[in-house]
């Protein structure tokens, strides 16, 4: 009982002492979110609505008509999720993309084909927070997102299936009746079954782009043919003439075309081109 009375006395003393203490005053209690508006730099304010508007402007202004480019335009027209950007800026996966694209000229493909300058310029502006009035942060993010997706899909589809559709390109070179101005039929010069990039392949590649295996998948799309590897090594030589480099580039592209291989021994005849193998 004595212990209980003692504890009760202590609690009563502490309670009375606490009641006599002055209330704690917080110096920032009057600050609201509106009070922070003066600290906000509008130059760095990201607007999802503005980013979408700029992406729509880029895709509508695009004159590219390849299957990959049309796929990308439909992807953003349907309001699908962004792959390379978010409200914090650019994803680190863009660095992996740039790293792989930086070596594309070793494959006899120009960096212009994969919008390398647009991507690196936009990425640099975001990292340095260096924006211009006519290219603000929202435009820069939109440019990075749009061109990164086009570049990525152009690269993986081009390295796997070829950057040129041989049937579409070669079968529109010669007219059947060149002297007849009314004739619109072309002579068939390429009639070999060749694999083509499809929506399923691009869907699977976009899933890889949003994951950590991005760089690995990009490198896995490279042609493994030993003849292609030999041509690639020759293309890296510094003593080649322009004509030699062009010839190597054309043959490297031909090895990218995926043609079905027969089982065992077989004869392959390209009738339109009169080639017997």
Task: Indicate residue ranges for each PLM-predicted region.
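A broad, structure-centric signal for solvent-exposed, well-ordered loop/edge residues
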Residues: 7-8, 259
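C-terminal motif of bacterial Sec signal peptides marking the signal peptidase cleavage site
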Residues: 15-18
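Bacterial N-terminal signal peptides that target proteins for export
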Residues: 1-7
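Auxiliary tRNA-acceptor-end handling modules of aminoacyl-tRNA synthetases
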Residues: 20-277
């Amino acid at each position: 009982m004595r212990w209980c009375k003692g504890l009760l006395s202590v609690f009563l003393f502490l309670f009375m002492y606490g009641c006599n203490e002055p209330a704690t005053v917080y110096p920032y209690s009057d600050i609201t979110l509106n009070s922070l508006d003066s600290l906000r730099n509008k130059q760095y304010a990201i607007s999802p609505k503005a980013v979408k508007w700029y992406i729509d402007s880029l895709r509508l202004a695009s004159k590219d008509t390849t299957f990959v480019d049309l796929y990308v335009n439909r992807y953003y027209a349907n309001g699908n999720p962004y792959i390379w950007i978010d409200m914090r800026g650019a994803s680190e996966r863009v660095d992996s993309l740039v790293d792989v694209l930086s070596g594309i000229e070793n494959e006899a493909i120009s960096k212009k084909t994969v919008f390398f300058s647009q991507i690196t310029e936009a990425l640099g502006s975001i990292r340095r927070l260096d924006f211009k009035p006519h290219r603000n942060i929202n435009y820069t993010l939109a440019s990075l997102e749009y061109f990164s997706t086009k570049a990525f899909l152009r690269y993986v589809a081009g390295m796997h299936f070829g950057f040129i559709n041989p049937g579409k390109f070669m079968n529109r070179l010669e007219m059947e009746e060149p002297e007849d101005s009314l004739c619109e039929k072309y002579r068939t010069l390429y009639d070999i079954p060749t694999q083509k990039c499809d929506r399923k392949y691009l869907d699977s590649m976009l899933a890889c782009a949003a994951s950590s295996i991005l760089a690995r998948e990009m490198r896995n799309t490279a042609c493994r043919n030993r003849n292609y590897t030999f041509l690639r090594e020759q293309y890296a030589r510094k003593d080649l003439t322009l004509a030699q480099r062009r010839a190597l580039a054309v043959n490297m592209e031909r090895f990218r075309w995926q043609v079905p291989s027969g089982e065992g021994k077989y004869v392959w005849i390209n009738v339109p081109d009169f080639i017997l193998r």
